[in-house]
Every structure is written in structure tokens, then in C-alpha cells.
């Protein structure tokens, strides 16, 4: 797993270690980006499982689609290409650690890794042999993906709270004020965001680059504009004010250009219903709330200006 804060994420990782291993089972599908090929049928469930292992080791898109069938193309992306790649590598590692086929009623399951995790796509009897039933495994794969991403996002928001508190413990711009960061990525040569490129011998920034790049607006560095990409399926935005339903009532966190009154963050899925369902918010109090914003999640979350958890938001912890 990627380390994205200096200390806090190491303390939080144990909360979702098991969920991470589960995710490795389906993240291997993200390698399948080429045109679908004809689905293979095999003489036995064991042969089907061996074919999947061979395709994983080869790293071939065509071979994976040939084993899993064209339906697998719909399941190839979690919304985070970097994390998908890591997941594929760990899936292969788990397969190499241990793999076996077990019967479950009229179907067979491939079980991999030292913790005996079942691959979510069962092997079933077809007219001419045995094949992976990708269509029936779709719901399970999406449930695992969404559940994993949402658990990670809750912990990420708590880590951002820790990072903001750490940031505010020092005067970052020499104005003798302790303040929170208004953005994730600092301008070149400055420390006005939660992430900056550390110089040799310098203390690391409160968050790491991968999370910083998940800010929804993208960012500019050295006159180059970079598009945002999601962090484990989610985008993040810093909010600078709160509304009537927040504890303490409505007020701006920014006073005379300095964010000293508090902070808030919203995290929302990059692909609604695929990389996640719930949108999450948190402020300086450290309590995470969640809500399903529906099919217009991207637009609603991008337009969100206030931290304002009314009774349609429920605690996520």
C-alpha cells in the first residue's frame, strides 16, 4: 500500500489490511484493456485456474480476456490506475504463494494466497467444458471494489485531518501565524499546501504526492498543467467554510486571507457506482459523514462550497 502521510497512515493501515488483500483478487482484471477475445473453455476447473495463473504471469491483456471472457472488460477499472497496477502485482504474488480449486455446490472456486481468499469469479460447467462465469461474479467484484475504496477513503480523510493539524503546528510562510493549508499542493518553492517536494535533509510534507494529486481541480507546477487522478477511486477537495448544520453554525474558516478558523474536506467517487457510491465529508472535529449523492455525484461534489452535514448525512464511523 502506498504511504501518503508521514506518520498517521502507518497507524491507520491495520484497519483495512484484510480488505486490501480481498481487493487484490479483483484488481488483476485492470490489465484487460485490449479488445475482447473469444472466451476459452477448459477440460477441467483445475485447467481453467492454471490458465488464469499463466495469463497473470504473462501480463498479457489478450490472454486474460481469453481466459475470463469479454464480460471482464466492463470490470477492468477501479478508477485508480496506479492502485490497480499494484493490486495486479499483489494478486500474482498471492497466486504464487498458494493456489487451489475447491468445489462449492455446482461450481468451483479458485482460492489463492496464504490467507485462502476466493477469487470472485466462479468456474462453472459449460456445454463444451469449464469456464470462468464472469457475468455472475460482476456484482461481487463491484461490491468488493466499492467497499474497499470507501473504507480506504474514510481512513484517508482521518489522515488528512491529522496532516492539517501537523501543518498548523508550524509557521509555514513566516508571517508568525499558525494556520491550516488551503490546498493540497504547494506552489513551487513554497509550503502553502499539504504537500511539497522536500529538499535534502528537510522534513517531509504532511501528505504524500499520490494523495495530493487526487485534488479534483488538477494542479499546475513549473508552468505545466496536470490533470487530477483519483486516489483509490476518490477525488478530494478542501472546503473553506461551513453552513448552518455544522457545529458552531455558519462561518468562514478564512480570516484576512488566512485559514485559521478550521478546515473541511469532501471526498467523492471518480466513477459513481464503480469506484465508490458514498460521498464523504469531514472537518477539523474529525467526524466523517457519508451520503449517496446519486447519479449527479460529480457535479454536486464539485459545486459543494460548505461543510454542512444536515440530517441526510450519516456518520461513517
Task: Briefly describe each language-model feature range.
Residues 42-65, 138-188:
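Conserved hydrophobic/amphipathic alpha-helical signal-anchor segments
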Residues 72-119, 225, 229-232, 242-244, ...:
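Surface-exposed, charged secondary-structure patches
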Residues 167-274:
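Flexible, glycine-rich surface segments
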Residues 261-317:
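C-terminal soluble interaction/assembly domains
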Residues 33-35:
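Bacterial signal peptide processing site
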Residues 1-15:
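N-terminal secretory signal peptides that target proteins for export/translocation
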Residues 28-31:
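C-terminal motif of bacterial Sec signal peptides marking the signal peptidase cleavage site
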Residues 108-151, 155-158, 287-292:
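Short beta-strand edge/turn micro-motifs at domain boundaries
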Amino acid at each position: 500500500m502506498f504511504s501518503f502521510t508521514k506518520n498517521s497512515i502507518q497507524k491507520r493501515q491495520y484497519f483495512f489490511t484484510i480488505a486490501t488483500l480481498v481487493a487484490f483478487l479483483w484488481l488483476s482484471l485492470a490489465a484487460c484493456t485490449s479488445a475482447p477475445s473469444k472466451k476459452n473453455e477448459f477440460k477441467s476447473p483445475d485447467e481453467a485456474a492454471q490458465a488464469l495463473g499463466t495469463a497473470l504471469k504473462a501480463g498479457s491483456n489478450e490472454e486474460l480476456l481469453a481466459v475470463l471472457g469479454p464480460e471482464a472488460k466492463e470490470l477492468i477499472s477501479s478508477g485508480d490506475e496506479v492502485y490497480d497496477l499494484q493490486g495486479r502485482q499483489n494478486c500474482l504474488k498471492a497466486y504464487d504463494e498458494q493456489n487451489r480449486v475447491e468445489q462449492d455446490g455446482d461450481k468451483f472456486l479458485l482460492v489463492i494466497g496464504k490467507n485462502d481468499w476466493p477469487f470472485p469469479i466462479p468456474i462453472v460447467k459449460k456445454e463444451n467444458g469449464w469456464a470462468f462465469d464472469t457475468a455472475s461474479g460482476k456484482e461481487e467484484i463491484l461490491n468488493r471494489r466499492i467497499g474497499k475504496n470507501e473504507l480506504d477513503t474514510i481512513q484517508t480523510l482521518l489522515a488528512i485531518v491529522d496532516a492539517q493539524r501537523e501543518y498548523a503546528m508550524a509557521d509555514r510562510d513566516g508571517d508568525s501565524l499558525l494556520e491550516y493549508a488551503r490546498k493540497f499542493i504547494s506552489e513551487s518553492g513554497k509550503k502553502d499546501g499539504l504537500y511539497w517536494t522536500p529538499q535534502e535533509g528537510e522534513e517531509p510534507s504532511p501528505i504524500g504526492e499520490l494523495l495530493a494529486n487526487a485534488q479534483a481541480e488538477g494542479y499546475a507546477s513549473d508552468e505545466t498543467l496536470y490533470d487530477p487522478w483519483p486516489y483509490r477511486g476518490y477525488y478530494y477537495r478542501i472546503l473553506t467554510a461551513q453552513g448552518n448544520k455544522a457545529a458552531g453554525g455558519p462561518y468562514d474558516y478564512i480570516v484576512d486571507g488566512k485559514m485559521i478558523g478550521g478546515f473541511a474536506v469532501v471526498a467523492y467517487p471518480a466513477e459513481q457506482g464503480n469506484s465508490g457510491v458514498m460521498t464523504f465529508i469531514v472537518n477539523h472535529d474529525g467526524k466523517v459523514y457519508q451520503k449517496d449523492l446519486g447519479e449527479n455525484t460529480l457535479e454536486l461534489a464539485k459545486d459543494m462550497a460548505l461543510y454542512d452535514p444536515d440530517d441526510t448525512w450519516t456518520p461513517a464511523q
